[in-house]
């Protein structure tokens, strides 16, 4: 209803101003600004909804602000371009419509009415309401009744007798199991669900609506609210360090806790969370690649579900035979938005909906088949009688190709339990939420029936039952939950450990590299990883007077304040203000001590603008002083005009990438020497090894042969035509996820370049 009211007010404002208000520059600017705000808010809502499926929520702040790189960003380029073009067109059209009767005399009453209607349209819009609620949740002091509802359970389970298998199905919400809405979509896993305790009304709350948040909620009984934004949890050394979570209780009770997934464990800090709370045995894409039968059988996120669940079954067999008490958690990935992936062993590879194939539904049908096969193996084993199997979604599906059909249904998360010791078949329609999952499992295992804000759905009363406004209540508790991190509020001295690549201050530890915004009563960490924006781009968003401490590789800050370190890959520390003074210090000891030194200086806006502009230079446009092309730092020597076909810098150098160009092309600003030696330090990937690799300068071509290890080769060139471009053509680029960014399409690697140097020959 509010959407219709908001749009009606917007339309009325446009029509009244366009036809009645007349000419007045101030009223035109004010009305256009407010109407433009309405458009921006609604486009923001649309864009956020595209990513999250739930509008502007905490997942937008946590996952999208600084982490599109790890979200399969290529899938969203076209929608992003469409939004920008649409916004430009709408603003242009608005301005044209409002000025249609600009030659008519100004009418104060109609101008005021149009402006008030425009303000009303903004106030009534769902986007404004959602943003207002988010802002309030960031600034509240908390709710006095939090302590009454947050309960810490006993740290142990007396006399535990059951092993636990807990399966997180990526985005595998219960809605998919509605056979009337989606016939024969989930027959195998749906049949198993109907054999156990099926909790049919598991609500999704703020702070539980993306993978790591769903894991925290289900194991600790609290939403994931943190004193920082972005994927900073990937950078911290501990995760809710004061809280008692399910993994802690299991470990204290004699369980060995295992976690197996196909993606990289570092994504969003899952490794940090699990290690902080009782899990000593973690297996992700890096750990599995030396174990699985086919390490090259991967999707954009990691290993396919059939591979992961096969490894989980092997681990279940091994642990069961050992006789030790254990928990085995696993997380699937094939149903990840926006399209999902199909394991090659599935019988169900295709699902049609509305008369055409649907990739997301197909991925769901395939993944549930794999999960069901895993469960059936456990059920058929002699160890099932000592096992509790839990299947849950980590969160509701985000905007995938099935999302519009899901939204027509009553959506709930999946949570069901199959007990080997005590078969129970029942559908429980009690109102509950993800935070109740851990408490319910704890209750079944013989522990307490509460965990944080979670309550057992078998013997307790969920917060979703107690509070009709549970979403608003959860946001009201946000400051109380943030305080559970015990996060430092000041930074005066710090220590950098080069062996561990860590920085420590005020009792907290963070992985490097790291950017920190430091104010009087708050220290905000902003990390960099494969899944977040580069720190220099994050620093470019700082205000002129914001105090910062930036710890990174020296070459990344050298172009601004330390050109002598332009080729150094050592650690450096920069601190200051973008509009004031900055210092750069080289970290020259294994354990390096530093102090913050922020001076209250006069802000120079010209200096600020220059710093911001330099920080925003993209990697390929950076230039440094050197007599050779060094590939393990960003940019190129000053003599290079442009280059293509080359991937991002890595610690050793860069790969050629045929996804970016079939050949490596380096164009220099001036013609290459008439006679020169080309000294190439490089290696080959896969089948490119031991094969002739053409290297061309103008009309002359030489042959380069490389192995799988780095070697240096010198080629002799004559350049009578004054050519200015060097071309290297890898013979057989290989499509691979080796060293790839999680969630990105495979690269096509040919040769790995460490250094290329042009040496002029006399004569």
UniProtKB/Swiss-Prot annotation:
Q: Which InterPro entries match?
A: Alkaline_phosphatase_core_sf, DUF7024, OpgB, OpgB/LTA_synthase_biosynth, Sulfatase_N
> What reaction does this catalyse?
a phosphatidylglycerol + a membrane-derived-oligosaccharide D-glucose = a 1,2-diacyl-sn-glycerol + a membrane-derived-oligosaccharide 6-(glycerophospho)-D-glucose
Where does the protein end up? Answer: Cell inner membrane
Alphabetized CDD domains for the sequence = LTA_synthase
**Function comment:** Transfers a phosphoglycerol residue from phosphatidylglycerol to the membrane-bound nascent glucan backbones.
PANTHER family with a match to the protein in the record:
LIPOTEICHOIC ACID SYNTHASE, PHOSPHOGLYCEROL TRANSFERASE I
Its name, as the record gives it, is: Phosphoglycerol transferase I
Originating organism: Escherichia coli O9:H4 (strain HS)
Q: What is the lineage of its organism?
A: Bacteria, Pseudomonadati, Pseudomonadota, Gammaproteobacteria, Enterobacterales
Question: What gene does the UniProt entry assign to this protein?
Answer: mdoB
């Amino acid at each position: 209803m509010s959407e219709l009211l908001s749009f009606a007010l917007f339309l009325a404002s446009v029509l009244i101003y366009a036809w009645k208000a007349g000419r007045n520059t101030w009223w035109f600017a004010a009305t256009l600004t407010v109407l433009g705000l309405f458009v921006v808010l609604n486009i923001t809502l649309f864009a956020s909804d595209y990513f999250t499926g739930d509008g502007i929520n905490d997942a937008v702040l946590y996952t999208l602000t600084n982490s599109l790189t790890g979200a399969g960003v290529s899938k969203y380029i076209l929608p992003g371009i469409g939004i920008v073009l649409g916004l430009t067109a709408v603003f242009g059209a608005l301005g044209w419509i409002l000025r249609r009767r600009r030659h008519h005399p100004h009418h104060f009453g109609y101008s005021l009415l149009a402006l008030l209607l425009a303000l009303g349209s903004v106030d009534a819009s769902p986007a404004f309401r959602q943003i207002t609620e988010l802002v309030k949740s960031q600034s509240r002091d908390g709710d006095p009744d939090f302590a009454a509802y947050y309960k810490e359970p006993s740290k142990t389970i007396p006399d535990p007798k059951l092993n636990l298998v807990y399966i997180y199905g990526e985005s595998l919400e219960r809605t998919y199991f509605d056979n009337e809405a989606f016939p024969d979509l989930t027959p195998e896993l749906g049949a198993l669900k109907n054999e156990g305790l099926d909790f049919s009304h598991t609500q999704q709350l703020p702070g539980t609506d993306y993978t790591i948040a769903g894991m925290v909620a289900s194991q600790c009984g609290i939403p994931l609210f943190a004193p920082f934004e972005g994927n900073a949890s990937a950078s911290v050394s501990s995760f809710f360090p004061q809280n008692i979570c399910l993994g802690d209780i299991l470990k204290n009770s004699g369980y060995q806790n295992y976690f197996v997934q196909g993606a990289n464990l570092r994504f969003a800090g899952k490794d940090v969370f699990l290690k902080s709370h009782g899990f000593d045995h973690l297996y992700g894409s890096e750990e599995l690649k030396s174990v699985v039968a086919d390490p090259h059988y991967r999707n954009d996120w990691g290993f396919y579900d059939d591979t992961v669940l096969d490894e989980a079954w092997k681990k279940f067999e091994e642990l069961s035979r050992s006789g030790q008490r254990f928990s085995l958690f696993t997380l699937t990935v094939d149903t990840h938005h926006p399209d999902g992936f199909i394991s090659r062993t599935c019988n169900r590879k295709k699902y049609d909906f509305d008369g055409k194939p649907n990739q997301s539904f197909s991925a769901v049908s395939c993944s549930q088949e794999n999960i069901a096969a895993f469960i059936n193996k456990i059920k058929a084993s002699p160890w099932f009688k000592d096992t509790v199997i839990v299947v849950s979604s980590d969160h509701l599906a985000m905007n995938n190709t099935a999302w519009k059909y899901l939204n027509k249904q009553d959506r709930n998360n999946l949570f069901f339990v199959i007990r080997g010791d005590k078969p129970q078949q029942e559908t429980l329609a009690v109102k509950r939420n993800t935070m109740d999952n851990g408490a319910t499992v704890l209750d079944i295992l013989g522990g307490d029936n509460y965990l944080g804000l979670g309550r057992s759905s078998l013997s307790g009363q969920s917060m979703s039952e107690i509070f009709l406004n549970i979403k608003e209540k959860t946001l009201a508790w946000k400051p109380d939950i943030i305080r559970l991190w015990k996060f430092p509020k000041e930074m005066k001295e710090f220590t950098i450990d080069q062996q561990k690549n860590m920085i420590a201050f005020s009792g907290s530890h963070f992985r490097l590299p790291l950017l920190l915004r430091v104010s009087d009563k708050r220290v905000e960490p902003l990390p960099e990883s494969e899944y977040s924006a580069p720190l220099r781009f994050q620093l470019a968003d700082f205000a002129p007077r914001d105090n910062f401490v930036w710890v990174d590789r020296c070459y990344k800050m050298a172009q601004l304040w330390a050109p002598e370190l332009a080729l150094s890959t050592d650690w450096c520390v920069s601190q200051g203000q973008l509009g004031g003074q900055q210092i750069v210090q080289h970290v020259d000891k294994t354990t390096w001590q530093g102090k913050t030194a922020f001076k209250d200086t006069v802000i120079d806006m010209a200096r600020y603008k220059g710093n911001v502009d330099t920080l925003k230079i993209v990697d390929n446009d950076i230039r440094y002083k050197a007599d050779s092309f060094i590939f393990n730092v960003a940019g190129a020597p000053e003599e290079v005009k442009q280059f293509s076909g080359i991937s991002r810098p890595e610690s050793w150098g860069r790969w050629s990438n045929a996804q970016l160009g079939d050949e490596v092309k380096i164009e220099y600003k001036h013609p290459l020497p008439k006679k020169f030696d080309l000294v190439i330090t490089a290696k080959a990937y896969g089948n490119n090894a031991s094969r002739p690799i053409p290297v061309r300068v103008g009309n002359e071509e030489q042959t380069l042969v490389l192995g799988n290890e780095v070697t240096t080769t010198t080629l002799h060139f004559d350049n009578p035509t004054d050519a200015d471009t060097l071309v290297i053509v890898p013979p057989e680029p290989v499509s691979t996820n080796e060293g790839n960014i999680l969630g990105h399409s495979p690269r096509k690697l040919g040769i790995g370049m460490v250094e290329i140097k042009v040496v002029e020959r006399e004569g």
